[in-house]
Amino acid sequence: RMPNGVLYRDADAAGLAFTCRFTLCVGRARLPAQTLLHTEWFHADCLASYYGVAPLSEEHWRILENFIRAAGEEHGINMLLTPVFTPPLDTAVNGERLTVQLVDVRRDAGVYSFGFEKLGRWAGLCRRHGVEYLEIAHLFTQWGAHATPKIMAVVDGQERRIFGWDVPAASAEYRAFLEAFLPALRTALEGMGY
């Protein structure tokens, strides 16, 4: 709405740019629900590094929630990259990111088992702040899918890296892992309402 219907206009010397002053009245309106899936690569490890906190410590969870809230409530992002394993993205070949892994992996006597509690906490934060969808971290390295992502596990009582750049993506060992992991992940996500 312009007072008295008058537009105040001051053009520059060439007449190419101008400023105008007016009063804008914003009515009460609500946009329809967003239907576009808007995902972003959300690097939880970078937040831990930047703020100097231990990955998945309570302070890190507080920081994550602040950024998830901003993404979902302020920026219309309704899907986030979810680090079930440390995402093998934006690294040099043979490089590693700081470990941020939401799925606990165990291998005892060659048998895999998985814990999804941290993934459930992440999903709860996302849903609470309008992020309805999860983009699961890539299961292969970014540069040609030649290798496996870094995956940490407790193997016979000792935590260690079981996959990474040194393990080919097409290896029988990784295939056996995926055959155990993917059905368990699907069941866990369905249990969380996905």
Place the predicted regions along the sequence by residue.
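Aromatic-lined carbohydrate-binding surfaces of glycoside hydrolases
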Residues: 1-194
